[in-house]
Design a protein with these regions (language model features):
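Residue-level signal for the nucleotide or nucleotide-sugar donor/cofactor binding architecture
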Residues: 206, 249, 373, 404-407
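Acidic, low-complexity intrinsically disordered segments
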Residues: 2-3, 7-256
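Conserved SAM/AdoMet-binding glycine-rich loop
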Residues: 259-391, 398-400
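Conserved, mostly hydrophobic/aromatic
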Residues: 232, 254, 348, 416, ...
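Catalytic cores of alpha/beta
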Residues: 130-139, 331, 401-418
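Radical SAM enzyme core and accessory elements
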Residues: 1, 459, 463-529
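A general structural detector for well-ordered alpha-helical segments in enzyme core domains, enriched
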Residues: 35, 98-109, 254-257, 293-300, ...
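Flexible glycine/acidic-rich beta-alpha junction loops that bind and position SAM and/or redox cofactors
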Residues: 76-81, 274-286, 351-363, 396-407, ...
């Protein structure tokens, strides 16, 4: 692993323990639970399907094992968060470290037991093997499952039985890549790297299952997560989810999955996954300006709370969607009992303060507003969300499509500073992430923050971290979350004690890079602190 930003002993302490029952995972990623449910629905016996805890995978690999599937969200550390905090993979991430360790143990178990199980990697991160194909052979991967456009995870839960039967029967070995099929296509890719050639079997799947073909989970998902919709409809060029067609779960379907988490997992909260909760129930083909469907959202959250959960929050939402209907967020807050002791977190893509970049890459993200109104939308949304006890966690993209100018970066810095000054009691966090080529920009290049000559990107990182430490960690982050938890108390103490260290590290980096980097840091301290 080498010299990590976060020492391994600290990472292992912070990383939540996942319980198991004789090696069977009590909780599992939601997508994996969907595949499990699809297999059971399609005729596989319960004793033949197991979602194994990764620490106990060896218990379930033997001579009779046909398939070992791994759920991989960021297997090689190329996701935006990981790329940012490993300086563009200059250090090995814990994602990559533990994924490699898992595959090493799978291969060791196969060798020990004489198993001929086919190992297949699936999940939203399998596109990364296209950039590091040497890992395919190193990990002994029989196949890699990916969507038609790589970055988007395929929806095999609607056809799980067919997929695994094809695997077991060996049909993917001789499937004609040129034959028109309605479900799967096999592509044997060749990658030339230096003096070596690597090959990989990529199984593409692009069929869109109808709602009645999508199974409901039968065992608990991690963190009480359940999805309420697929797709987004906003059309941001840098996002892969927008490539997926829109479908909405009925409130009844949502309730059934929450009840599984309550009854089998003892969970008292529901983490509602969507890629923009404010799109739920909307028909973007007829709703020209993407105004939210307030009635549908109120019905959805009323159904969620009727299950008896104490807390619920959506994973993602747009700032424009939060304010497009002035009654929406206040009404939802009443339904969910949001308040000072029951704050609602939501991740929102701020992306950039640059009006130019927003208009070029994400203009429908602002609908029903116009790109030139972007700063007003951000400020008004923070005000509205906070007044109703919602806390947005902003993500930003640094080096968007390698098209970001210094002035674009300064617009972002100024916007955050204006929010602090105009709304001194506001609650939000801001996390800058390096650009990763997915979605409609998958042919672009990764943005390498470590080798760039523009000091403004360091300034964006510096300003956002200063905000998170001064306004986030010290003012409200340590006041939320699980009360009385030893782990939470310890984490809060670490955050308050160590939270300022990255600022010093960035100042040191600026001194090492030279005067123009130092001037950016000093300008922020003088004008935007």
């Amino acid at each position: 692993l080498g010299n990590q930003v976060t020492p391994k002993i600290l990472f292992d302490f912070i990383c939540n323990y996942a319980p198991h029952n004789n090696g069977v995972a009590k909780f599992a990623p939601y997508g994996l639970r969907k595949v499990e449910a699809g297999l059971l629905r399609d005729g596989f016996k319960r004793e033949d399907v197991v979602v194994a805890h990764p620490d106990h995978i060896e218990k379930f690999i033997g001579p009779e094992t046909e398939v070992v599937g791994t759920h991989e969200m960021d297997p090689l550390g190329m996701g935006p968060v990981t790329m940012t905090f490993t300086y563009g993979r200059k250090q090995m991430s814990y994602d990559e470290f533990y994924c490699r360790h898992l595959h090493q143990r799978i291969n060791a178990a196969k060798k020990k037991t004489g198993s001929h199980a086919k190992v297949i990697a699936g999940g939203s991160g399998t596109w990364q093997y296209n950039y590091a194909p040497e890992k395919i052979g190193e990990y002994g991967l029989y196949a890699i499952l990916e969507g038609e456009l790589g970055g988007i995870a395929p929806e095999i839960d609607g056809h799980a039985g067919n997929f695994f039967n094809y695997l077991i029967d060996g049909q993917f070995e001789n499937m004609d890549p040129f034959r028109k099929r309605k479900d799967f296509k096999v592509d044997i890719k060749e990658f030339k790297r230096s003096d070596k050639t690597h090959h990989g079997r990529f199984v593409n799947f692009w069929d869109r299952p109808d709602l009645d073909e999508i199974p409901e989970i039968v065992e608990p998902s991690m963190h009480g997560m359940i999805e309420v919709m697929r797709g987004c409809g906003r059309g941001c060029k840098f996002c892969d989810v927008t490539l997926r067609s829109l479908r909405y779960y009925s409130p009844e379907k949502v309730k059934k999955e929450i009840e599984v988490n309550i009854k089998k997992g003892g969970v008292d909260r529901a983490w509602i996954h969507s890629d923009d909760i404010f799109v739920y129930g909307m028909d973007p083909t007829t709703t020209k300006n993407m105004e939210p469907n307030r009635d549908a959202l109120e019905e959805l959250f009323t159904a969620i709370m009727s299950t008896g959960v104490k807390h619920t929050n959506p994973t993602h939402g747009t700032l424009a969607g939060a304010i497009a209907d002035e009654r929406l967020v206040p009404n939802l807050s009443k339904i969910t009992n949001a308040g000072p002791n029951n704050l609602t977190g939501i991740q929102c893509g701020l992306e950039t303060g640059s009006v130019r970049l927003i208009e070029k890459y994400a203009d429908r993200k602002l609908a029903p507003y116009q790109p030139e109104e972007w700063h007003w939308v951000v400020k008004e949304a923070v005000k509205t969300l906070n007044e109703n006890y919602w806390i947005p966690a902003f993500t930003l993209i640094m080096g968007l499509d390698n098209d970001e100018t210094p002035e674009d970066g300064w617009e972002t810095i100024r916007l955050i500073s204006e929010l602090e000054r105009e709304q001194p009691d506001s609650m939000f966090t801001a996390t800058p992430l390096t650009f990763v080529p997915i979605g409609l920009l998958e042919k672009s290049e990764f943005y390498d923050i470590g080798s760039g000559d523009d000091p403004t990107q360091l300034g964006v990182m510096y300003k956002t971290w200063q905000h998170n430490f001064k306004y986030g960690i010290k003012k409200f982050m340590t006041k939320t979350g699980q009360k009385g938890s030893v782990r939470r108390t310890a984490f809060n103490g670490l955050a308050r004690t160590l939270g300022g260290i990255p600022l010093g590290a960035m100042e040191k980096f600026a001194r090492r890079r030279g005067p123009k980097f130092e001037r950016v840091i000093e300008k922020i301290k003088t004008n935007y602190w």
